[in-house]
């Protein structure tokens, strides 16, 4: 059997990137910072309705709804136009989902939170 050489190459690249960026501890720290920033905004106002209870929240996939669900399609359209794509929730659950994987930067989460604040001011 021939090993999956491309898969091995990609793993090597990912492992090197992890090592150069603080290892697993660095990745965990960055991911917590990103999710904490977003959850702080979600918890700040009744405009946003996070799905998960605080003790069960994910650091990778943050899901929520808007208290007035008729605004969700507007939020998603406006977010896409602002360069914040891929926020549509799971097809079975709906709502909004931000996936904060390792490649997602803290600056992109800050941009999302800023957009959310502006959206709430306009529609809240």
Predicted regions and their residues:
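Conserved PLP-binding catalytic core of the aspartate aminotransferase-like
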Residues: 48-79
């Amino acid at each position: 059997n021939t090993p999956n050489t491309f898969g091995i190459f990609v793993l090597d690249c990912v492992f090197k990137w992890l090592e150069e960026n603080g290892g697993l501890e660095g990745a965990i720290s960055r991911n917590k910072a990103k999710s904490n920033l977003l959850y702080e905004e979600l918890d700040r106002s009744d405009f946003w309705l996070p799905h998960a209870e605080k003790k069960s929240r994910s650091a990778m996939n943050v899901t929520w709804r808007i208290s007035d669900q008729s605004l969700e399609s507007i939020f998603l359209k406006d977010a896409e136009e602002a360069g914040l794509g891929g926020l549509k929730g799971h097809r079975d659950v709906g709502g909004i989902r931000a996936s904060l994987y390792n490649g997602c930067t803290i600056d992109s989460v800050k941009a999302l939170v800023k957009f959310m604040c502006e959206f709430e001011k306009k529609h809240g």
